[in-house]
């Protein structure tokens, strides 16, 4: 009976976690890590069926990611998201946020020790 109760309690907890997360306050960009910033601000445009092409960290090697981010101001000058209130993506993300995304992409590039697709 104890085992059944434990399993039932675990099942109830597992099923209630998504509801708890839905009630959570949204995370401000300044509090996001690199992967969350990437999923929130990059992945929305860079999908498989996008005219901009799909990109995940392991699609490029580290040096290529550095080149992408070095050219970000120019290449994304016209890129705007609904969440940026009309600011270009580079202007909205600015220094520290863009640095976190860059670090995430470089750290998980194809030639890194931990390549990642970012799901």
Locate each region found by the language model:
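Positively charged n-region of N-terminal signal peptides that target proteins for export
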Residues: 1-5
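Bacterial N-terminal signal peptides
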Residues: 7-16
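The canonical Cys-X-X-Cys-His
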Residues: 38-49, 101
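An amphipathic alpha-helix signature
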Residues: 39, 62, 66-74, 98, ...
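N-terminal, post-signal-peptide region of Sec/Tat-exported proteins
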Residues: 47-80
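Electron-transfer interface patches adjacent to heme c in soluble/periplasmic c-type cytochromes
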Residues: 56-57, 62, 67, 84-99
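C-terminal capping alpha-helices of c-type cytochrome domains
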Residues: 87-119
